[in-house]
Amino acid sequence: MLASGSKGNATYVSDGSTSILIDAGLSGIEIQRRFDTNGLCPEDLDAIIVSHEHSDHIQGVGVLSRRFNIPVYISRKTKEASQHLGSIYDLRYFECGTAFNINNLLLHPFSISHDAVDPAGFTIEKSGTKIGIATDLGIATLMVKEHLKECALLILEANHDPD
């Protein structure tokens, strides 16, 4: 976890051969500093995945994508609502409910409760092991619980209050 909270979110996931960043909600310089502090290299990222359009999740996406030639995966609705994303090196779309691969990782995006256009949580699977990530989770709906069942690791940020 590189950052979590209303000032910025960024979660690094790697299996040793494929590395992804879920959200880049800090400046590109700050994310690069946090990578350096943790002995990581942003140029080794295979993808940046965007959960939703709020600035604390997308602030550094465009800069990192352009600087290190990193593909960005985002839903179409989130892209349309993202006013401060900037230009992207390689834009790829996903849809909640439809799994997709990044190299040897299988990602399952699913809808979550949050005050955004098309907010997504994710499970990431490899060789039968599954982890789950859901940020700004308002309500753990039955669908969310179903997706997060049997995760070996679960990362939840539940600071969104729908009321």
Question: What role is predicted for each listed range?
Answer:
Residues 29-74:
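Active-site metal-binding motif and surrounding structural segment of the metallo-beta-lactamase
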Residues 44, 102, 149-150:
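Alpha-helix C-terminal capping/helix-to-coil transition sites in glycosyltransferase folds
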